Each structure stands twice: as structure tokens, then as C-alpha cells.
UniProtKB/Swiss-Prot annotation:
One of its GO terms (cellular component) is cytoplasm. This is tRNA-specific 2-thiouridylase MnmA. ATP binds at residues 35-42, 61, 147. It is found in: Cytoplasm.
């Protein structure tokens, strides 16, 4: 049965109508594999592309056994959406890849005292690249589409594809997409990039999609899968008690594992002090959580490794730039001075020959090794990398 036959109302919202027109005008072949998680965003992505006249096939990556998105529940909902839209549905078992690339990386990172950013790595290593390869090799489909809230534009002056923030700043997911290469941007479509979440719900209802009212996941998929992030970490990392210390080494408390803490954390320290203390460092070698007052916790800059320049060519070494940088998903971008520096041996071993040094216009709180430092010029994502060496 067609998507039109399943609609509960016949008229698209203004945002939906504009999304349909963009899809109809999209350059190149209109044949696509839509990544379906079983949630409302990817469901509407498929429905809009069918309505816009694209040849659509659904593709679900099976990432974990158990309940939730990426698991059995997500597979069932994704299959149901494809049946409702009258399009084929395919499942690719990616569980081994997910464990190797994401689960093990998370465990290793937390053991080393960093707070990893698994979503950006998952997007590059588990989702987008493998999905494109599958679409081309198995189904001869030239494009993929996902339900991410981000936008893509072709700059006809330099011939590069630009990654832009999603129109809905509360749902914008460009922070997690900075690591995509140009060859992926050239072949991916984000139909929801100029919709708000409210628009998505309305359009999903218009199409009568079974996922229209499905609740959103509120946490990292692994945390949802295990019940909490602590439960996930406890399943992989044996507890190891240690000291909580001030920056001068004074012992002020005890902890049950550095993996349960992150930079900037104040609650849950179990310390009575004259003023609130925040985590400023996780010392894996000493198995210590280092704390300080907020006034002492500001950082003037950091180095950023494993850089990917997504929308522009890599700048030359020692060339300065003024940028906006976002250092956590929910944080606001801040002004910073950037200079490209020599890559480390570790960067080069990971085939990432680019590194930069950031100096913030004003000292920043919660600069967290392992998190992304994503660089923006207004709405355009210039690139990004992983924070290390805060100063």
C-alpha cells in the first residue's frame, strides 16, 4: 500500500511541503536506502521520500541483542514501517562491528580516564560508511538517507559539500556528524534538516505512522540497553577504589572507580567542603579523581587531535583562524583562536594527520578529554576532533 493511502490527512504542513519540494528537486538519482532505527525520525524520513517519488528501500543495522532501538524492538518497528509504506526492508547484522568499534572503545576510554564520544565514531565507522557500501554493493543504490537533524549544501564555488546545523537548534545533531568525510556527504540526504521535532511529529501523524507517538530515547543507546551508564560500565570494568584529591594532592574523599566520574561533575562526590567542588581531572595512572572549586576549574584552551575538516580543506600548519567551538553536545559555542599544529604519532597511526590548538576567548568550564571540539562558522560545521591536553 502506498504512503498516500496511509495518510490520516491529505495536506502536508508547510514544513512538510517544503521538505517534499526539496526532495523532489534533489540533484541526481532518486534511489535511496533509508537507515531505519524504528524511531519516528527515520520513519518519517522514509515516508517523505516515498511521497516525493523516490525509490526507497529500508535498511536497519542490528547493533545489539535485547530490547530498545538498535535491538529487537527497533527491528520490529522498522519492519512495520516498511510494510506500511510498501517498500523492501533489509537487516544487516552489525553486532560484531559495534562491539569492536564502539563498546570496546568506550571501555578502553573510561579505563584511561577520558569521557568518550561514541556517537560520532559510530556514525562514521558503524553507520554511514558501512551503510553506503552495503547500498551500493548489495542493492546498487547510489544514496543513503537518515533522520538526523542536520543539513547538507553543495558549495558550487569550491565544489565541496557543506555540513550545516539542523534548523531546530534543540535537536541539531551536527555535533555528532563532524567526522563524516566528503565522499559520504556527497551521497547522503537529511530530509528532516529543516524541520523541528514538532513538525516531525505532525507529519508522522499525517502519514499515520505507527511510530508517530513513540517516545524518544533519553540516553546513550548502551545506557538504555543496560538500564544506566553505570550499569554498562559495571558490566565491563571491575570496581577499583581510589582517592579523591585536591589539585595539591590533599585527600578529601574516596571513589569506587574513575569511570563513574566526568569533568565538571559536582553531584555525587560525597564530599563536605566549604564550597562546591568539581571534577577537573581523572588520573588513570594514580587512580585518582582530582577536584577543585569552580573558580579554579576554568581552562584557557586545549589541543584537539584526530581532526576531520568536513566542510573545508585542511588549513596549512601555523595558519591562525578565529572560530566558534562547541565542546559538548548541549553547550553553546564559544569564540576561540585556532592554529593548526603538527600531528602526533598517535594521530598519524590513526590516519588522522591533522591537529590543532585552541585558545578560548574566555576561560571555559568542563573541557573534557575524549569529547568533541566541533568548529563552526555560523551554521556551517568546519570540522572537529577529540579534546586532549586541556590547559
Amino acid at each position: 500500500m502506498s504512503a498516500e493511502a496511509k495518510m490520516t490527512t491529505s495536506t502536508a504542513t508547510q514544513a512538510g511541503a517544503e521538505a517534499l519540494e526539496r526532495l523532489r528537486q534533489w540533484p541526481g538519482e532518486h534511489r535511496v536506502a533509508v537507515g531505519l532505527s524504528g524511531g519516528v525520525d527515520s520513519s518519517l524520513t522514509a515516508a517523505l521520500m516515498v511521497e516525493a517519488g523516490w525509490e526507497v528501500e529500508g535498511l536497519t543495522l542490528w547493533l545489539m541483542s535485547g530490547k530498545g532501538a538498535c535491538c529487537a524492538e527497533g527491528l520490529v518497528d522498522a519492519a512495520g514501517i516498511c510494510q506500511q509504506l510498501g517498500v523492501p526492508h533489509h537487516v544487516v547484522d552489525s553486532r560484531d562491528t559495534f562491539v569492536r568499534e564502539i563498546v570496546q572503545g568506550l571501555v578502553d576510554g573510561y579505563r584511561a580516564g577520558i569521557t568518550p564520544l561514541p556517537c560520532s565514531k559510530c556514525n562514521r565507522s558503524v553507520k554511514f560508511g558501512p551503510m553506503l557500501a552495503w547500498a551500493e554493493q548489495e542493492r546498487n543504490l547510489p544514496r543513503i538517507a537518515t533522520g538526523h537533524y542536520a543539513r547538507i549544501r553543495l558549495d558550487r564555488e569550491d565544489g565541496r559539500w557543506k555540513l550545516l546545523r539542523g534548523l531546530d537548534r534543540r535537536k541539531d545533531q551536527s555535533y555528532f556528524l563532524y567526522d563524516l568525510p566528503q565522499e559520504v556527504l556527497a551521497r547522503v540526504v537529511f530530509p528532516l534538516g529543516e524541520l523541528t521535532k514538532a513538525d516531525t511529529r505532525l507529519e508522522a501523524g499525517r502519514h499515520g505512522l505507527r511510530t508517530a507517538d513513540k517516545p524518544e530515547s533519553q540516553d546513550l543507546c548502551l545506557a538504555d540497553h543496560h538500564g544506566s551508564m553505570r550499569a554498562f560500565l559495571d558490566a565491563y570494568i571491575p570496581p577499583r577504589d581510589g582517592e579523591i584529591v585536591l589539585q595539591d594532592g590533599t585527600v578529601v574523599g574516596q571513589h569506587d572507580g574513575i569511570e563513574h566520574f566526568t569533568i565538571g561533575q559536582r553531584k555525587g562526590l560525597g564530599i563536605a567542603w566549604s564550597e562546591p567542588l568539581h571534577v577537573v581531572k581523572l588520573d588513570a595512572a594514580m587512580n585518582q579523581v582530582v577536584v577543585a572549586t569552580r573558580a579554579e576549574a576554568g581552562r584557557t584552551g586545549c589541543e584537539v587531535g584526530a581532526m576531520n575538516w568536513v566542510s573545508i580543506a585542511p588549513p596549512p600548519l601555523d595558519s591562525p583562524m578565529e572560530v566558534e567551538v562547541q565542546v559538548r553536545y548541549r553547550s553553546e559555542p564559544v569564540r576561540a583562536h585556532l592554529i593548526c599544529i603538527e600531528a602526533t604519532a598517535n594521530d598519524r597511526a590513526k590516519e588522522r594527520p591533522h591537529r590543532c590548538k585552541l585558545t578560548f576567548q574566555e576561560p571555559q568550564f568542563s573541557i573534557t578529554p575524549g569529547q568533541g571540539a566541533v568548529l563552526y562558522d555560523g551554521e556551517v560545521v568546519l570540522g572537529g576532533g577529540l579534546i586532549d591536553s586541556p590547559v
